[in-house]
């Protein structure tokens, strides 16, 4: 049975500044975590969920990612690429440029530099607003969080018994979240905050394992968790 979101996007254009000098010669999505590199964990999970096509945006050392992944056949996917000038578009601009390659609405987006044990079929079958975010407990490096979750509503400010949480980098978006923005550099965070202000953003809390692999310490932690997960299978 086809999955509810047949098209997905993986964000893989970042420079990985905090992991230099490693990322001077290796793009962050190709860093190994366990038996696969970061981006391959996503590709395998997307294929298992029933995704047909994945768009990957590329900039820094993007040719290495494209050479490694190819057309996606070995993952059971069709993979296409959206090439960007390095540092030119930001996350929102990268998604905006790639919309021409994404013909389904809504669609799933995953940051290429996170590691998680999320089962993608736990995402909702449909969304009512412009976006839906997967939120996690606030890590040490982001103690104040990004948003507040009140029921299934994502808010910018606390209300009642709402909970402060961190955006995981995994979301479901409608095209109209981006369509009204001019082409070029666009902050995804700003678009999401605008959607939250307009009561157009829903979310869910994910209590499982999740790491933003942005520093050497977090990379080591992700590798430890991956080893532990393999032993527990």
Name these PLM-found stretches.
Residues 132-146:
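Short beta-strand-to-loop element that shapes/binds the nucleotide-sugar donor at the catalytic cleft/hinge
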Residues 108, 115, 120-127, 138-141, ...:
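Catalytic-core segments of class I nucleotidyltransferases/pyrophosphorylases
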Residues 29, 78-80, 130, 200-202:
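Conserved beta-strand segments of alpha/beta enzyme cores
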Residues 5-22:
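A phosphate-binding catalytic loop at a beta-strand-loop-alpha-helix junction
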Residues 1-10, 32, 36-111, 180-183, ...:
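Conserved N-terminal catalytic core of the sugar/cofactor nucleotidyltransferase
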Residues 24-28:
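Short alpha-helical oligomerization interface
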Residues 19, 65-69, 222:
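Hydrophobic packing residues within well-ordered alpha-helices of enzyme cores
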């Amino acid at each position: 049975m086809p999955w509810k979101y047949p098209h997905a996007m993986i964000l893989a254009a970042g420079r990985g500044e905090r992991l230099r000098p490693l990322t001077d010669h290796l793009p962050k999505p190709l860093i190994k975590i366990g038996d696969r590199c970061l981006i391959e964990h996503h590709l395998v999970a997307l294929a298992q969920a029933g995704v047909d096509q994945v768009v990957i945006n590329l900039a820094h050392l993007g040719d290495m990612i494209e050479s490694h992944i190819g057309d996606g056949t070995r993952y059971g996917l069709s993979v296409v690429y959206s090439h960007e000038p390095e540092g030119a578009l930001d996350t929102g601009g990268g998604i905006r440029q790639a919309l021409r390659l994404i013909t389904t609405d809504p669609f799933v987006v995953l940051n290429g530099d996170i590691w998680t044990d999320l089962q993608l079929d736990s995402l909702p079958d449909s969304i009512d607003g412009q976006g839906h975010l997967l939120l996690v407990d606030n890590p040490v490096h982001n103690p104040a969080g990004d948003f507040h979750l009140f029921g299934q509503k994502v808010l910018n400010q606390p209300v009642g018994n709402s909970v402060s949480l961190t955006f995981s980098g995994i979301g479901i978006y409608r095209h109209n979240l981006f369509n009204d923005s001019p082409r070029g550099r666009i902050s995804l965070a700003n678009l999401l905050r605008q959607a939250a202000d307009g009561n157009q953003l829903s979310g869910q809390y994910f209590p499982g394992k999740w790491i933003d692999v942005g520093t050497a310490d977090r990379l080591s932690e992700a590798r430890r968790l991956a080893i532990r997960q393999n032993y527990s299978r």
